């Protein structure tokens, strides 16, 4: 989505007049576009097919594994939240993101953690609509979450929100969410965890 802004800035034009080509199908991307950019046109290249284009703009991705983030980009994306927020309330919730249906990145001692964090609200992002995810993170003062794409929702948090990201030690070099938090004024900590056989 941030690439839309690059086109808009570079050519001072409406990015929705272009057709976007995706390498892989993404249900999340489709939901985002349907909600925020209903007029956007995009296609997914089927596997084992080769396409030829007369005109093609290819955005760079110099750090594919960690993502690229510039300070102005999350601020631009963040304004989209105003389109779907049902109401503006002061942040007041302490939430724990759980991944009970996930194959990996589950928290083995989650029940003990929930007992220790009495009063915190458990949230399963997979069961929420995009609008509900935006609202949930906008209302949070504290967030504990395993590393994962759901932390993209940090975009909707107010400055000063405290975040603890649980991640495996081998992921230490992945700084995309701490960098995102830095640009948004969030207080982000990373807790390195061990892998336990299930």
What are these regions (language model features)?
Residues 1-198:
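The feature primarily captures lumenal catalytic ectodomains
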């Amino acid at each position: 989505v941030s690439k839309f802004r690059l086109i808009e800035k570079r050519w001072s034009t409406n990015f929705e007049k272009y057709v976007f080509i995706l390498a892989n199908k993404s249900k999340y991307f489709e939901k985002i576009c349907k909600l925020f950019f209903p007029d956007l046109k995009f296609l997914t290249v089927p596997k084992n097919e080769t396409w030829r284009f007369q005109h093609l703009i290819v955005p760079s991705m110099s750090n594919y594994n960690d993502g690229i983030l510039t300070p102005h980009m999350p601020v631009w994306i963040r304004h989209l939240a105003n389109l779907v927020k049902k109401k503006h309330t002061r942040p007041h919730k302490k939430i724990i993101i759980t991944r009970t249906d996930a194959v990996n990145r589950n928290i083995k001692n989650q029940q003990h953690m929930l007992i220790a964090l009495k009063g915190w609200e458990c949230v399963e992002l997979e069961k929420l609509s995009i609008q509900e995810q935006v609202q949930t993170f906008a209302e949070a003062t504290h967030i504990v979450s395993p590393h994962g794409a759901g932390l993209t929702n940090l975009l909707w948090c107010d400055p000063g929100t405290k975040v603890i990201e649980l991640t495996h030690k081998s992921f230490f070099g992945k700084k995309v969410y701490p960098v995102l938090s830095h640009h948004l004024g969030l207080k982000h900590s990373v807790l390195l965890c061990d892998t336990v056989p299930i």
